[in-house]
Amino acid sequence: MDNCDFSGYATRNDLLCGDGVTIRKDAFKGNDGCEVPLVWNHEHNDPNAVLGHAVLENRDDGVYAYGVFNDTEQGQTAKKLVQNGDVRSLSIWANQLKKIGKDVVHGNIRELSLVLAGANPGAYVDFVMAHSAEGEEEMEVSWDENIMLYHSADTEKKGENKVAEETIKEVLD
């Protein structure tokens, strides 16, 4: 999409989300081409939390979003946060969900939020366009798989914190 301020995955398919659900392919295909509000942290009750809008594109691996910030103070602040890489995570709010077990197979995306940490590990900004006052445009492209760092202090030492491996039957007997 031309003239977007940023783009990235609103949600990715087949990844276990922090809320315990997994979004499956084409669950939101009905939103392909739709424009939804871009909101700060799912704040639905505050009009000042609306930062702009996003156009959604259904893809084989998820729903991609092209975001445009509005010219409000909040919209421009959010734009700077995204341009600086301070906020990179995206999150959807959807309703009319149909699930098979913990798999979301259908739904309707109502808004896209910029969040500090999203539930879907594949939902993040991967492209930022910077528009200059002279009319020139610059872009930053990144590929971020939200890498988890494990420090040596986090690893379990042999013999410490060993979890008992008893069956339920053994515990009840």
Task: Locate predicted features.
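Polyanion/phosphate-binding surface patch
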Residues: E43-H44, L51-V55
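Small/polar-rich, solvent-exposed N-terminal microdomains that initiate assembly or binding
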Residues: D19-P47
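Generic alpha-helical secondary structure signal
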Residues: D26, E73-Q76, K162, E166
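Amphipathic alpha-helical oligomerization/scaffolding segments
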Residues: G159-D173
